[in-house]
A protein has these predicted regions:
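Short glycine/proline- and charge-enriched loop/turn segments
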Residues: 131-138
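Conserved, well-structured interaction surfaces
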Residues: 9, 15-23, 48-122, 138-148, ...
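An aromatic- and glycine-enriched ligand-binding surface/loop that stacks and positions planar moieties
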Residues: 1-49, 125, 129, 150, ...
């Protein structure tokens, strides 16, 4: 499947496409997952938006339900899967050390970034370190304690810096 340095570099660039998708969802972004949940927020005058927007109120009051757009972590896990593909397949390709470090470092850093947001918003969560290559129950792993999620983040950041 991956046969050239170009394949690995293209897949690494694809990580950022996936990451942009994760944060381009209507209300699933750092503002909604972060600042809006911890303090007063108001839309500026002239935006045509109201603080009474139901999803915003759910976020602010911490009364989210599964139907709220801001509760969907699937785009973050799609990004993690792209990172896992790079981490699995790039080392099997002959390429320059600089490009290998670029690919693996980016994959580790972005995977850590995604897990940071998952841990911050949801706490306990599945920790997946291999690409999804099948179907069935294997693609629905159980949640790990949030401490294990943070340990994965730390490992990835150390490896990315290394």
């Amino acid at each position: 499947m991956w046969t050239s340095e170009s394949d690995a570099l293209t897949a690494t660039t694809g990580i950022y496409y996936r990451l942009r998708q994760a944060f381009a969802q209507s209300k699933a972004n750092p503002f909604f997952w972060g600042e809006l949940r911890v303090g007063p927020a108001m839309w500026g005058k002239g935006t045509g938006r109201s603080l009474c927007d139901n999803d915003m109120l759910d976020v602010m009051l911490n009364t989210l339900s599964a139907s709220d757009a801001s509760t969907d972590w699937s785009y973050l896990y799609t990004t993690i899967d792209q990172c896992n593909q790079v981490l699995k397949y790039a080392p099997g390709i002959g390429m320059s050390e600089d490009n290998m470090n670029y690919c693996l470092g980016n994959a580790r850093f972005i995977r850590a970034y995604c897990y940071f947001w998952i841990a911050r918003v949801w706490g306990d969560a599945p920790v997946i370190t291999t690409p999804t290559e099948g179907t069935g129950e294997a693609i629905y792993p159980s949640r790990h304690p949030v401490a294990e999620v943070y340990a994965r983040i730390e490992d990835d950041l150390n490896a990315a810096a290394g």
